[in-house]
Every structure is written in C-alpha cells, then in structure tokens.
Amino acid sequence: MDSKDTQKLLKEHRIPCIDVGWLVRPSASTSKSSRPGKSESKANSVAPDIQMDTARPPVFETSVDSSSSILSSNDKGRRHSVAASLLMDNQRANAGSTSVPTNIPPPRGRSKSVVETNLSNVEADSGHHHHHRHHHHTEDAPAPKKVGFFKSLFGHRKKDQEQQEKERERKERSPSPTHVDRGAAIRRERTATISAESPPPLQYNAPPSYNDTVVPLTRSKTESEVYYENHPQSYYHGRMRTYHSPEEGKVDGTSPADDHNYGGSRPDPRLMDFLRYYKSKDYKLAAFKEGNFIKSSASPTTKKNRRASFSLHNDKPQPAKSLAHQKFDAKGRPIPPHPDAPKLPSAFRKKHPSNASIVDTVDSNSDVSSSAQNNNQTPSSHKFGAFLRKVTSYGNNNNNSTNASSLSANVNNPDTSSTSLWSSSSMEFDPSKITTVPGLENIRPLKHVSFATNTYFNDPPQQICSKNPRKGEVEVKPNGSVVIHRLTPQERKKIMESTSLGVVVGGTGQLKLLNPEEDDANAKSKEEMAPQKQNEVEAHDEEDNNSQRRNIVMAAAEAAAEARAKEAPNELKRIVTNNEEEVTVSKTASHLTIDKPMISRRGASTSSLASMVSSDTNGTNADDEGEILPPPSLKIPHDIVYTRCCHLREILPIPATLKQLKKGSTDPIPILQLRNPRPSMVEIWSFSDFLSIAPVLCLSLDGVQLTVQMLRIILSSLVYKQHFQKLSLRNTPLDEEGWKVLCYFVSKAKSLHSIDLTMVPSIKTNVQKPSKSSLKSKILRMQCNLENRSDMNWDLLTASIALMGGLEEIVISGAKMNSAQFKNFILVACIATERLGLAYNGLSKSQCDDLAKWMVQSKVTGLDVGFNDLNGKLSSFTDAVLGKIQKANEKNVFKFLSLNGTNLRVNEHDTFENNEVLKLISVLCYLENLKFLDISNNPAIFPHCVPTLIDFLPVFVNLVRLHIDYNNLSSTSVVMLAEILPMCSRLNYFSMLGTELDLASSKALAEAVRKSSSLMTLDVDYVYMPENIKEKISLYALRNIQGELKRVNSDDKDIKDSQFSSLQDQLSLLLTEKADNSEHYNKMVENFMAKIALARIKISKVVHDLFDLKLNGQLNLEGKEALIRLCFIEASLERGCDLLKQRHNNTLKSPEAVSKSRKGGNQAQPNSESCQRMLLSSSILQNSDHIALMPFGSAIVEKSSPDAEDAVEFREGDDSNVNHEDVPANDQQFRDEVDIKNKYSIIKRELEHEKLVGGGDLPVDKEILNRAAQSLDSDQIKEFLLKNDVSTILGVIDELHSQGYHLHHIFKKQGNQEETAFRTKDEQQSSQSNDSSANASPTTDPISTGSNTSRTNDNAHIPPTDAPGFDKFMNNAEENAIDAAYDDVLDKIQDARNSSTK
C-alpha cells in the first residue's frame, strides 16, 4: 500500500486496518508488495498532544495492526499463542467505527518487515492537530493455505454483521448524530516500532489517565499489581464521564481540584461521590450506622480468581453498553438480553462476600474481565480460552466459569442488576451500595492463620542455632569465591571443645499418641498395683532415683557402644575418604553443653504449666479416662505464649517484648510496643502470631520502619480481634501502598476505637537503638516525608473511617491537610469522634471555622489544637462553646482542652470583652465537666492573664488538671496562683514546669498544697526549691492522698467537700443546668444572688478594715494571707454573678440591688445556718470520673488490691535537717526509722490541727474559736478562715463580732520589741534583695540553690546546714520572703480595686 492510497483513504475519513484473516482463510486474495524482497527498517514514533478541531472535519489516525512484525518467521510459536489471538480480537474492537477496505493485501507470514509510523501535522484556524499517519510496507503474500486447526479457533463473524455492530457502537458513544468525538479515544493510542530481529515485548494501550504510560505485556496477575502500585487510577471513562460535572475537582463547590492532589495525582471521582454521599447525611450518626447505605448495600460478589493468562488490554476500560445492544452467536443469530432480575431466588449456595466489590469488577485490570469481554465479542476466542484454561489455570474451573459469566453480565450490561453500583435510570455511580471504599478494590484481604491459646500448652521442640557456631573449613568471601582451609586434628579438637551446639527448646508436651496402646495399658495396671505416695519427700526421692537411673542407663549405653567399637574389625572402624584425615570425636566434645536462654526466669515456664494442670485435675491421675490434654479451658500466661510463638518460628523470645509481659499474668494487656526500630521478618511473624491470640488492647508501632508486607502481616493479625481498641503509628513511615493497606484495615476492623497517626519529628518514641545488623540489611522499607503527612491520601482514610462507622479517638498531629481534605475529614470521618488531636496542623481561619461547626454538632469531649497559630482565630471556638450551651435538651460533655503553644496574646489593659483569650476563659466556666486545661507555652498572655485566671478558676468546680508550663511567670504571679489553688475544690494535678522558683514562690506553693485537700501532684522544677520545702510538699501530698483514699473507701455519701463546696457547686449548677422549670430556676437564681450579696457585704467590710491596717503597717503575716484569700473570694463571687447575668441576658438584678431590696423589706438578715439550708445539690456534679484512655487524663484513685506490685518511692535528698547526734554513723537502717518517725509525727500534728480548727468534715467548734479570739491567736483564726466554706467563713465573722472581736484587732501586729526589731531587720533585708533583684535573675537570691555565685558572696550570712540554728534561720528567711511577696500581691490587688472604682 503506497502513500497515494493512504492519502486517499485519509481524505475519505476512512481508517484502514490490516486483515488478519489470512491466518485462517486459505482463499485469501494475494497481491504483490510495492517493495519486493526482505527489508528491515526502523519505525519512528512521536506522541505529541493531540487536540480536535471542530471547524474542519477530523482526520483520524490509521490503526494498523503490527502483527506482521510480531508474528515473524523466526518465531512460529507466537502465531499460535493466546497473545496473538487476543491481539487480533482487540484490534477488531478498536477499529469499531472504521470500514475495512477489501483491497488491502495481507502481509506475508514470514516477512521480517516492520511497520513504519510517521506523523502528519494538520493545522486548522482554531488550533493545531497532530495525528498519526501510518505507511505500511508489506511483501508478497504467502501461498494459499489449506483449512486447518486455526480455522475453527479464529473463525470470525461476517463482515456485514461486524459493520452493523460497529455502527451501533459508534452511535451509542456519539452524543449527537452530527458530531462524533472519536479523537478522545484515539489521541491516547500510540504505536510502537518493533524490530524484526529482536522484537521487544508486546505493547498495549494504557488506560486513559492523566499521565499516559506504555507498559509492556506481562502476566495479568503480576502486571495489575505492579501497574496500580505505581500509577494513579483514573475513572473518567464510559458513562461516568457524563455523570461528573465540570467542577468535579471541587467538593461542594468550595474547593478547587488542585486542593485534592496527593503527590501529583488527581482525586478519584468515585471517592468524591462517596464523600458527598456521607456529607448529605447531615451529621447524624444513626444515618451512617443504620442508614440506607448499609441496608441497600451491594450483594456479595463472587471471589475474583486471577488466572495466569496473557492479556493485551488488561487496563483498557471498555465502554458500557446499553440495554438495546444485541449479541450474536457464531452464525449471526441475535441472542436475547438477560432479564433485569430473576423472579425466583437463586438456587445456588450464597458465598461469603469478598473484599472486592462490583466496582472492582467494572474497573478491574485483571484478565478475568478482559477475557469476559473478549468472549462476548468473539466466540472463537472463547474456545481457545477454554482450551488454555485447562492447561494454565490455577484455580477452580467451575469458579472461573461462574465468575466469567457473572463478570461479563456486569461489565457488558451493568443496568440489568438491581444491586449494581450503577443507577438503572441514569447510569450514575451509587455510593449507597458500596461495600469497599473506592480505590481499595485491588487490596488483597487481610488473612492470618492463628492457633487456639491452648495449642501452646506444649512447647514445640526446636533446635535453635548456636550464637557462637564453630568455624568450618569452607569460607565464602563477599565476592563469591570459596576458600577451603584444611584443619589439623588438633585444631578440630580445640574448636569442638570451645564452641557450643545451639539451644534445644521444647519437647515438654504430654502427647498420648506417642505411646502404644499396649504400653499405656501396662502402665495403667502397674500404677493401679503400685502403692500411693505418702508425702512429698518420697516423691522428691523418687524423682532423684529416676534421674540417677537415667544417668546409669546412659553411661551403660555409652560403654556398650565403645565395647562394640573395639570388637569391630579394623576395616569397619575406619571410613576411607579421598585425601581426608581421620577425625575422632573425644569424650569431652560429646558432652558439650548448650547455650543458655537469654531470659533466665523462663526456666520455670514448664513447671508452672504442670502445676496449673495438677491444680486443675485436683490430684487425679494424668492418664485417667476422659481427660483431655491440653485442657480446653486452661489459661496460659502471656509470657509463655509469646515464648512458644517464638519457638514455633525457631527463634528465641525477643527480650524487649518479653519484658513488657508480666510473668504469669493472663489479664488483658493494656499496651504492647514493638521497640525494635528495624525488625526482621521472622520477628514480625512471631510478634503477629502472639498478637492474633493475646488480648492486647493497644498496639504501639511508634517509630518502627516496616515494609508493606510487614505491615500487612501485623494488621492481618488484628483485623478480626474483638477487643482490640487502639493502634498507634506515631512517626511510623508509610508510603502510598502502606497507606492503602492501613485504610483497608481501618475499614474492616470493627472493634477499633482509636488511631494515632502523628508525624512530628520533635516527639520522641520509645524505641531502641537500631542494631548494626539491621542497618546493614538491604530490605526495602517504607519511606515517606518525615516532617508531616501532607502528601497522604486523606480522603481515602476519611472514606475508610466513615465506612466502618467512625472512631472514638483520632490523633492526626502533623497531618497538615489542605482545606478541602480537612473539611471532608472533619465532617465525614469525625462524625462519631469524641476525642480529636489536631496539634501541629497549621490550622487556618477557615479550618477553625469548620472545626467549630463540627464541635457544635458532635459529641466531642476532648480537643487538642496545640502548636497551631490561633492568634485571632479563637472567636470560632468561643462561639462553638456558646452554641453547645444553647442547644436544648443536650448535656454539654466537653471535658478536655489543650491550647499548648498556640501563640495567644493578652495586652496590659485587655478585658474579657475585647480580648478573645480572656473571653474564651470566661466562657469555659459554662462547661460543668471541664477537667483538663492546658495553656502552656503561651508566655505572651502572662502576667496580664493572671487576674482573669484568679477570678474564674474557682468557678471550674470539676477542674482536675491544670497546665501552665514554660510561661516565664514572675514570683508575684506564682504567689497569686498559689493562693487561688486551694479554692479549686477538685484540682488534683498542677503543672508549672519551666518557671524558676525563688524562696517566696516555693513557700507559697507549699502552703497551697497544705491548704488544699485535693491537690496530690505538684509538677514544678524542684531544683530551685530548698530541701525542707520539698519535704513539706511531699508530706502534704501524702496527707491529701490519704484523704482521697478515705473518701473513695467511705460508704457515707453525705460527706460534703471541705473547700467552698456549697457556693461553688451552686454557682456551677446555675451556670450549666438546663432551665426546664423557669419559675423554679428563677427563684433559685434570686436566692443565690441574695446570698452572694450578703456575703459580699460582710467580706467587703472586713477587707476594707484589713487594707486600712496594712496601709498603717500594722497587718501581720497571717492577716495578709487572710486578706488575699478574702479578696479572691470576693472577686470570684463577683465574676460568678456577671456570668449569671450574661446567661440571662442581663435581666437579673445586681447583687447590690438585691441586698438593698432585702434590707428594705426585711430587717433581720439570715444567719449562716439559714444560708446553709439554702444550698442546692445536683446529681450532675457526682459523675465526674476521668477517662482512663486519654493521654492527658489524670489517674483515678481506686481501691487497693492485694495483687498490686507497684509502689511509689519518695526520694529524700539529704538528712541534714534531722538531728543524728545519738545515731551511729554506720547504722543506715536506724536513721531511716528516725526519719519515718519524724515525718509521721509531723503528719499527725497536721491532721490534729485540722480537726482542731474544723477542717475536713468536722464542724466549727465555738468554744475553740472563743479561746482563740481571747488569746488573739491570729494563726488559728486564719486557719478558721482558710479551711472552711464561704458560708462558714461568714459564720466565723458573725461569731467573732458577737463576742466583740474584729479581725483587724486580731491580725494587728503585737507590741513586742523583739518582734518589731526582727521585722525591721527583715524589711531591710527584703529591700536589699529587691534592689539586687532588679539587676539579677531570681536564681541569684541568697537562699536559692541554683546560683553558685550567690552562695560565695553571701556565705557569711548563711550558717552551715549542720549548725543547730539552721532550721530556725531557714524558717525566718521563708517568712520574710513570703511576707514581701504578700505585700506585692496586695499592692496589685489594691491597684486593681482602685482602677475598677474609677
């Protein structure tokens, strides 16, 4: 065929195609080639981007078959292969809309010519078009052949039927009769030049993706896995192209398509449809768990079997055919279409649903669908395929045929099935019928073979290689060369004596089948005739006798063997070998010992099992009738199970894993960590064997580098576990394939509650240092971006979580998703999430808005947004909290909030009305269940945030844990916070790391622990704290722990809290409880406001008198402490009233107005007893338990257990404060006893003093109060004011006033000259220290232990620690420091009061 004919055909818009009928038709017409002779040429192919021009009639490329070069004379076998047949079938299908001219000569079968491909550029007015123009060079046609075997195999339909079929297909694909867009399918097809001498592999047309690739022909099973691992899938073909809108890349029309790119690939449109379907459920969890998408899910599909057959177009999608499409048999007769749905139920047995859904059937790249399509197109190929399946199929032929028929029905006519993923009316993708997330169809199911636990009753006998094997004569060098070293008998003897022979483990089983039945019967009769054992001593003696008897038998056997060897003839003693010296094994070498196990305590494992069996059988004989070994209900300890799992894999147990298992324990394992950062495959297998049967609640793979296969093995052992709850993958590398495996696991693991996918390099993981052998390993492990997980396909994980019903806890720190992915994740994946970790995510304003919207709609209890720049973005969270409060008939369950390192700022004159941080703190008071608050690493909010914290912290009645770490607090701020801590009635944990403490702040913290009855943990930098203050804090913490244990163990529910329980609980109740009965609720609020007004009147009068006394310089230290406490109480009550007014839209009366109305209407003011009768109680405040699974939750005090083995050790620094004059120098035990007695006496005095002043649960004793007032004991009066409720404080003030005593008289300095001189000296020292502190840091204080320079300069003023007056000096120094700090606090309070009155 010359170039003129080609040009003529192009002008007629007809695409020629080589007719391959010469393979089977003997009467095929022949013609001479335009270029006679055998020629070899190289083909040049260029693949520019092709664009269609609608103005000019399109010019199509010629689709010329290259089988003439492939089926060359040098390779006759390729003509008979299935690849050739499939190639011709697919070529007929690709030439669907073209007419085949009859004057094209067929090529010769033995021709070595190649197909040359040229391109002609056709330019139009609107654009440039590039099309392939092929020039074919053929030779003389072969002689006619007889009808043979290929006639029946490759018989094809008649040409008129083929043309009719192709015309129908073209009309179906065409959007209109006048416009045929065939360039979309042609522009991605490429032709390749194949050399005749050394032909490369067959080329096939890749699927229409965004990155066109050409993949060589491989087996369909291997190719489909390799191709889809490295190339993004695309589903813009068939009917789906008409379904998606032009804004397919946008999600809800808000985000561009570029936001969904994952590593350069565009999103899957089916996945976007899937997410849109879930978002249409309007945030209702019931719609996900019990909605229509599960009820109408796709029917179980048959399992897809991959056959090892060749396929040319595995990945080429086939257009869906309409219902009107007719099929024809071999004789051209039409085949009626299959009915839409059967009228009767199926008679076949239903199979279990496989992981592959029907979507996988439509878009699968396996040869099953390809062969099914080819079978429907060409009946003759079906015969040849059936012939090959008998030879090369690896599965069941019946299943293959069933799958092929079902797949062909689904592929060719997807509208016929009622359970299809395609809508019958519009051919749209239906996400409601999905059983597998789009994009995970090709993931193989996770399967793991596990044994029952009692299988490990018998330790499997294994021979484990020695750790120090003996060296042999053969040495293999790294370059592959082999060197043989001849050893002398002396060298061999030395090696045998100095090396071990490995470890023999196992063999402790009691298998009855090992003994014949006759021997068992004889043994039974002998045991029945034998007398029973009298005691354990006789049993032990018998065991010794048995061991001695065995040793005697072994020695006799050895002696007999040596005697036989001596009596044997010489020619039998020696085995002659070629040029090899005789080697004899000495007696020493024959008795070599074996390696010892790495864990010594595992030696008693078998005995423990034997003891358990004996205890279970209650002394009965082990060989009794009906006894089953191993016992079916026997619980084997976890350490033994793991050891035997390792023995099954012929390795010793890994110590890092074995140490985490408590010896002899069968309880559920809270957490199990894989601590080897680069584990081997055998370690993974043994670890997964143990995971599959052990009750592990949480698995940590933090910082472990795995391969995809290793990850599959581990997840396969967890996917079907019933009680597995959490999977932690912090800083674990995951590539694209590993991410898909993880998503598949999440979609299938029904018991999974929590997942941690943190990727933050600064977070440390609990892994070991990698070994040298693991570093030298060449195993290709997963690699990814170690800074964050921004390149992961988060939409795929979103769909996986949504499909399994949601997760309770999700931690994705360092995810850094874009806006579209984040919105999908929050609105779809977190629909059932209660705890969400979003640290290190770089949240934007729009993402914060989406998160706040989700908070209002969800049941979230904990939120971590740490290390995100939230400056100017907190208004969304504030509105979300207010929105949750305003929701009717729903309880606010928010408990945990972390704002760690969020770049928050508070200026000097900001208030909660104009600053978002202060407003959020005030709004958090409405959360009655708030237990955890973290505002660490925000130094810009201090010190101006301290007054707001002081005002609102007492309102947080259920606050359990507070963190303000690394905020560079000043000493005055620390003292103010320490004074407010006792007012937090349930605060158990207070952390203030990163703050340098001076003597005053240390003393204030110690007093805070002493005044509080709930504070048990004070987490500060104790390096700046003197030793005596450390001891006091430890003693006060022990006292509080004892009180908490007493409260837990007590059955009396009427015990009230000792710290402001009445007013605080009442205020919290009024702020948070729903006003179901408006009249009753308003009456409660009015009574509370009246009580607050009366309390503020009395407290303000006392505060005014004490401030006047301070201005005159007559207020003592106890008075200053009481004054600070009263000021904080007054401010807290005022803030509570403001919050009540804000909630009721300022309709309530102010406390002053209420007090005036009460005074005018009723002269008699209610006393303290009547105030106590007005207290409210609510059941809401009783249920305030912490969630144990939270990473930042505090420990719950539980009842003591006799099996508890952990103990808390309180370390003491030195014993310099204890007088050891009468103690021997070397008697350490006696010194410890003295320390314990001293500490116990201190605790006893503290408890007695509390009982004396009415602390704890005892009421106030009026007689003791009168005696204290008469003696002007200011310290005891202060304890009355600090250790009781506000209403009790009011009663104390009224009682003192009735007796004629006033607080400004009691807290006035006494006229003692010695005390006055001491105070004067103290003021001078404090002024000097203040002057020096202006130019130095707090660590340069003379008393501080953190500065060596200050010690050397002030050495003369500090007595030695072993001096008799050291304790008195330190006490005076502490009082002086805290007195100066109290003055600073009172000055600031006075300034704030003056500024508020202006």
Swiss-Prot record:
Residues 27-36, 91-102, 114-123, 372-381, 1160-1169, 1338-1355 have a biased composition (Polar residues). Residues 159-186, 521-538, 1208-1223 have a biased composition (Basic and acidic residues). There is a cross-link at residue 221 (Glycyl lysine isopeptide (Lys-Gly) (interchain with G-Cter in ubiquitin)). Residues 1227-1258 are annotated as: Tau/MAP repeat-like. GO terms for molecular function: structural constituent of cytoskeleton. It is found in: Cytoplasm; Cytoplasm, Cytoskeleton, Spindle. GO terms for biological process: fungal-type cell wall organization; negative regulation of microtubule depolymerization. Residues 63-73, 357-371, 396-426, 605-615, 1325-1337 have a biased composition (Low complexity). The modification N-acetylmethionine is found at residue 1. Keywords: Acetylation, Cytoplasm, Cytoskeleton, Isopeptide bond, Microtubule, Phosphoprotein, Ubl conjugation. Residues 21-77, 90-144, 156-186, 191-210, 244-270, 296-382, 395-428, 515-548, 605-630, 1148-1169, 1203-1223, 1313-1372 are annotated as: Disordered. GO terms for cellular component: cytoplasm; microtubule; spindle. The modification Phosphoserine is found at residues 81, 309, 311, 354, 357. InterPro entries: DRC5, LRR_dom_sf. The modification Phosphothreonine is found at residues 222, 577. The keyword Lipid biosynthesis does not apply. Essential for the formation and/or stabilization of microtubules. Binds to microtubules in vitro. Present with 279 molecules/cell in log phase SD medium. This is MAP-homologous protein 1. It comes from Saccharomyces cerevisiae (strain ATCC 204508 / S288c) (Baker's yeast).
